[in-house]
Amino acid sequence: MTTTTATRDSKGRFTGSKRTSTTHNLGVIAGAAAGGMALGMLALLGRKAVVQAPTALAGNWDEALATEHEAVRKVFDQIEATDEHSTTKRNLLLAHLKHALMKHAVEEENVIYPALREAGQKQAADELTKEHGYVKQYLYELENMPTASPDWIAKIRQFRGEIEEHMAEEEMRLFPMLRAQLSDEKNKALTLTMNKEGFKVA
């Protein structure tokens, strides 16, 4: 697109000059796009920081994971407080539960379970990893069932029972044993690495 603007020459006479505004417009659009992208990245990083903050602030890695376990129990409580008419709420809570569990699984599978293996607990780490596979299976089945169905809430309760056994085994036996085997320095390094992994998927 071109525009004509009136200008005066050195003798004060009006002259017409043509200016192409396409380049100018493209510059404005590119600048706006870059600004929008930068704001989007800041918002994403801010959201990730908010999601990971409760874990990062909880203390050592085992305390942080116990905090996440408690958050999962609270989501189960909220789900079980719904009825068959609360389908939208159930879907939202299930999505929240899935995200929390997937982030938690990444932290454990990428950081804590390898540390368990290094500490001589390969069989226990393999069993915990296998149980995470069942978690994913439960989530898949729940996402593909009508949330108004009585079978859906029954599946939630079955899922909760199994996942609480898994969490209890970690909190009561395996995690305290691992923490006791590691030096303070190694525990701090494990905590830092775990929080980095959690931040990636928060």
Name every feature range the model reports, one short phrase each.
Residues T2-A202:
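Small-residue-biased structural context
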